[in-house]
Amino acid sequence: VLHKVVQVRLYPSKEQQILLAQTFGSARWWWNYALNKSIEVYKETGKGLGRSALNAFLPALKKAEDTKWLADCYSQVLQATTLNLTTAYKNFFDKRAGFPKFKSKHAKQSIQYPQNVKIVDSNIKLPGNIGVVKAKIHRLIEGKIKTVTVSKTPSGKYFASILSEVEGDVQATDEGKIYGIDLGLKHFAVVTDGEKVSKYDNPRHIAKHEKNLHRKQKKLARKQLGSNSRNKYRKVVAKVYEQVSNSRQDFLHKLSYKLVSDSQAVIVENLHVKGMVTLEDSLTLRYRNHNLAKAISDCGWGTFTNFLAYKLERKGAKLVEIDRWFPSSKLCSNCFYQISELPLDVREWTCPHCGTHHDRDGNAAINIRAQGIRMIKAEGSSVSAVGGEVSPILGRKSKFRHSPMITEAPTSTVLGKLG
C-alpha cells in the first residue's frame, strides 16, 4: 500500500468562506480547550487524557449555553482534532517533536475530514453544511481518498491536501546511481555519484526578499493594534513570506526530483537542525547566533530530506541517513586518515598521511556516500556502485542509523527539473 498526497487550490464562495471560518474557529477552540484540559489533569493527577477521555467532553460542551455553537461543526472534524492532539503528545513523549502548542487565529488555519470527501465534477464535496467547493485539481487523484485537510494560509488562500491510498507493491530497484550528499550554507548541496562531484548553490531565498519584507514589516508595525488596516496589511506581509516559502519549495522539489530520477539510493547526514540554531536550557530556547540560525532555517535541509524520502519510496529506492557524528569532513577519502581538528573556515586541506589535497565539502560527500554503501551492504541489500572499492573505516566506527520510510508526502507539486 502506497500513500500519496496531492494539494489543490480551493475557491470557496463567500457563504462557504464564512462556514469554513466557523469550522476553523471551532476546531481551533476545541484543540486549545483539550490541550488546556490535558495540562490541568496532568498537574492534578500526574496522568494525561487519552483520545476517548477527551472526546467524552464534547457532548456536554455542545449542550452548554456558552459553547452550544460547537454542535454546528461537523463532528468528525472535532474528533480528528482530538486524534491530532493525542498524536502530537505521542510525538512529544517519543522525542520526535516539541510540546503541543496552543493555536492562534492569526496563524495558518486547518481542519481535517477523515472520510466522506468526494470529487464531484472536478470539484471537492466536503461533508456537512459546506457542500461542493470549487477546486483546481491539476492531477489525477489515484486510489481511495483517506483524509482531506483543508487549510487557509495567512495570506488568505484556501487549499485541500488529499491523502489517498493506492494498492500495490513497489519493487525495490538496484539500478541507477548512488548519491552521497553533503548539505551546507555556501553550497546548498555538494553531490557525488562516485565519479564526479557537483555543487548546487544556496539560493538564499530570504535574502532576496529581505529589503521588501523589512519595509512592509515596518509599515505593519505602525498600524494601530486591532484596526482593519493592520489586519489587511498583515496579509500583505504574509504574502511576502508565502513567496519565500513557494520559491524554497520549488527549488527543493526540483533538486530532489533531479537526484531521485536516476538513483537507486541517496545518502545524507542525519542533521540535528534544531541543535544547530538554538541553545536549550531549562528555562528557554535561545538562538546560538541569530544570523546563522536564519541562514540555516532558510535552507530547508529537513524538508529536502523528507522530499527525497517520499520520492525514493515511490520509486522503490533507498534513503540512507548516516549518523550526524560521523567525521565526514575530517576523514581522508583516499587513505581514511582522520585529522583531529578542522575549523569551519578551513575549506581545503591536505592529508598529512597520504598527501591528498581535499576540498572540504567534496571530500565530505565522498565519505558520506562510502559510509552509506557500507550500511546498505551491512543490512544485506545489493547495490551496484561505481567509484572504486569501498574500504572499511580505520579505527573506531561511528554510530549510524537507517532512516524510516516516510509515507506522508509534502503538499506541493513538482514543477520540473533543474538545469
Where are these predicted regions, by residue range?
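Gly/serine-rich nucleotide phosphate-binding loop at the start of the catalytic core
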Residues: 1-78
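Positively charged, helix-rich recognition surfaces that bind polyanionic ligands
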Residues: 3-4, 141-144, 154-419
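Generic detection of short hydrophobic beta-strand segments and adjacent strand-loop junctions
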Residues: 6-10, 131-135, 200
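Hydrophobic (often cysteine-bearing) scaffold residues that line and stabilize catalytic clefts
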Residues: 16, 20, 27, 74-81, ...
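Alpha-helical coiled-coil heptad-repeat segments used for dimerization/assembly
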Residues: 22, 29, 80, 87, ...
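Short, Φ-rich (hydrophobic/aromatic) sequence segments
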Residues: 30-38, 81-89, 93, 213, ...
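Long, hydrophobic, amphipathic alpha-helical segments used as structural scaffolds
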Residues: 35, 39-42, 89, 93-100, ...
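Acidic carboxylate diad motif detector
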Residues: 52-154, 281-282, 298
